[in-house]
Each structure stands twice: as structure tokens, then as C-alpha cells.
Amino acid sequence: MHIGQALDLVSRYDSLRNPLTSLGDYLDPELISRCLAESGTVTLRKRRLPLEMMVWCIVGMALERKEPLHQIVNRLDIMLPGNRPFVAPSAVIQARQRLGSEAVRRVFTKTAQLWHNATPHPHWCGLTLLAIDGVFWRTPDTPENDAAFPRQTHAGNPALYPQVKMVCQMELTSHLLTAAAFGTMKNSENELAEQLIEQTGDNTLTLMDKGYYSLGLLNAWSLAGEHRHWMIPLRKGAQYEEIRKLGKGDHLVKLKTSPQARKKWPGLGNEVTARLLTVTRKGKVCHLLTSMTDAMRFPGGEMGDLYSHRWEIELGYREIKQTMQRSRLTLRSKKPELVEQELWGVLLAYNLVRYQMIKMAEHLKGYWPNQLSFSESCGMVMRMLMTLQGASPGRIPELMRDLASMGQLVKLPTRRERAFPRVVKERPWKYPTAPKKSQSVA
């Protein structure tokens, strides 16, 4: 075959290749199209950057934090064939504006439910372990962002950047995000957590920190479905009445509600019945309040250690901000609509990596997804996304099986016990300094 015929064959193959075919094993193209239609984001004009493929640009933007947007589009090769081999930077920005944030939010919500239901999570007494917690995001200092996201003030002084407040719900054994809500700094975390009540499934136990202590919120959380339990530290100075003793450091208690809480939460009664556990951890006495009042089904001896798993969501935030975002604290987007789009894309990309880690953990006996390296898995998924575009359709299932079987490469070693006591060393100086002269005693 002559070189001209080979180039012509490659050109014809590239013009007929549909990017959705190769990336469809990660995100269902029909699901993306359905989310675009539900959000009202449609276009009649055939563009080189289709809205379906711009969702992948948002995912790549979260995985490749240091790369410009047009470089991500070119590396993923998600544009349709045209006269120019590459896409202009301005075209990517215009495509992001056409896409908006609602479509990306719907893609995240639907995939979170789909992947969560498809994963066989381990249970505790028939309950799935969840946790909610808040996180702040810093946006670029532009007039549009400043107007949409008010700054937080400290002692009357405004913060340096506009900020977004977000509350996420995470399944603790797989680190899959199941729901999220965000607003401005004027919104409290309790207000954002209230938006997650309807998205919480039945037969779950949600671990919360003391910032979410609100009897109205906790009561609404329990009444929203069947066996939707919660556990939270008891607020300091909270008044309660003991009903009966269930065991050592285990009591059934009754807490009175305030008129303000009953006015805000119509379904809240004058009293709330809960279970109070008193546990000692590292020499410190802790009081935990929970809705699991059935002492026969939920043993109190195990519940004290159960709350320590809430820290998994903090580790998940560290994976997102430090590993995936490369510790770049400020988002890219300079307009509020694109800020929301970028945040939904970050959560979608994190879940995408985590779901692939779940698939890899299925090939490892005795390993859970949170025992695999997130940073290695994150780079592996991005490399696979770029590899799929150049692969023939027949090899795509083989490549996906290879990725699922690569769990041996990302296993974390067993954490060793500390051999020496912790030592805080002096910070190294850039330039040598003269030793301090000893002061004479007068």
C-alpha cells in the first residue's frame, strides 16, 4: 500500500469515527442527551464542539487542572472533523456558555444514583454508611463573581476572594458522592443539608459533625423515609431527660424543642426521643446522639467506633482539592454560571474516578476501593480517556477490561506502625543565619 492510500484510509476512518462511541463506556451518551433535553439545552445548528462532548471537556478540566481548556479538547479529540486540526480557545469558552450548569448538574445527579445503586456496598446492621460535611471553594475575583457570591467577612474585613459554600453526601466505604448542594456564604450548612434530605435513600445511617445539630433538621431527616438514621455529637450544654437505661453509657433520652424550631419545621413536635451514648476515646469522654433507638438491633458497643468513620469524607475532600485539583485553591471560571458548571464537573470527575476504582477493587481479593491509590487511579483514568480516542471500536472492550484489571498497580501498602515518636523539626532557611548570641544575665 502506498503512503497516500494509507493516509487517505486513516483520514476516512477519523471522519467516520464518533467520539461518543469510544467514551460511551464511561458515561452513557443517551443519559447525557437526556440530561441536555431535560435542562432545555438544545441547539439546532451543527457545531464542531457538540454539547454532548462538552460534558467530557468539563470532566477533563477537573482531571487536568494545569492544562488550558483548548488543550484538553485537543488531547481528548472530542471535536468533530473540520478544516482545522485544532480548536480555538474562544470556541471552547463559547461552547461552555452554551452548555450551562444545569445539564452538568443533572448528569452528576443521575450518574451518582446509577453508580451508587450498582455498587454492592458493605452494610452495618443493614444500613449503608453515609456522611455529610461542608467545604468552601474560592472563585476568581471578578465583578460578576463578586456580585453572585458575597465574600465572607472576618472582624468586619471582607475576604480576598468570593467563595462558594458546598455540602456533599458521601458513601464512606467507596467514597462515592451521592448528593451535593451549594450556595453562597450567606447560606448556612444546615440550609444546604436540608436540600439533601430527599436525595437520601432508605436504610441508611448518616454521620454528621456537631455543626449540623438541629432537632428540626434531624427529625425531618428521620421522617423522610424508612430507616433513615443519623448520628451526631451532643451539643455542649444541651438539656435532656433520661427515659430509661439501655446499658452502660447507653440511655434513651427525651429532648425538648424550642418554639422557633417548631415554627420553622411544621412536623416537629414538642419533644424528640433519641439515644444517647457515652464513649471514651483517647481519654476524652464523648456524647453521641442517634436516632437508632432499637437496642436489640443496633448494639451500643459498636456504635461508638462507628462514628470514627465520618473522617472518610474529610479524606475525600482532600483527594478532590489536593490530588485532583493539584492544590490550586482558586477555580478557573470567571462567571457565576461557569463556576457552578465547573463545580458540578469536579464532582462528576471525582465520582468517575471512584467508580473505576470500585471496578478495579472487584478484581482484588480482600481489598476495598478506599485501599487503592486515588492519585494513581486519577492519572490512569485520564490516560485511558486519551487512549480510547485513537483505538478502533473493536479494541475498546479489551482496553476497558485491562483498566479494570490494573488494580494491582494502584494497591496501597499496609500502613506501618510508627517506630519513633513524632518530632517537629525546625523549618529550613533559604540563607544561612548567624547563631544568636547568648544574652547576659543582669
Curated annotation (Swiss-Prot):
Q: Which InterPro entries match?
A: RNaseH-like_sf, Transpos_IS4, Transposase_11, Transposases_IS4_N
Query: What is an annotated GO biological process for this record, any one?
Result: DNA transposition
**GO MF:** DNA binding; transposase activity
Q: Matching SUPFAM superfamilies, A to Z?
A: Ribonuclease H-like (SSF53098)
Does Ribonucleoprotein appear among the keywords? no
Q: Would the keyword DNA-binding turn up in this protein's UniProt record?
A: yes
Where are the membrane-spanning stretches? none
Entry keyword set: DNA recombination, DNA-binding, Transposable element, Transposition
Role, per record: Involved in the transposition of the insertion sequence IS4.
Please give the family membership noted in the entry.
Belongs to the transposase 11 family.
Protein name (record)? Transposase InsG for insertion sequence element IS4
Q: What organism does the record attribute this protein to?
A: Escherichia coli (strain K12)
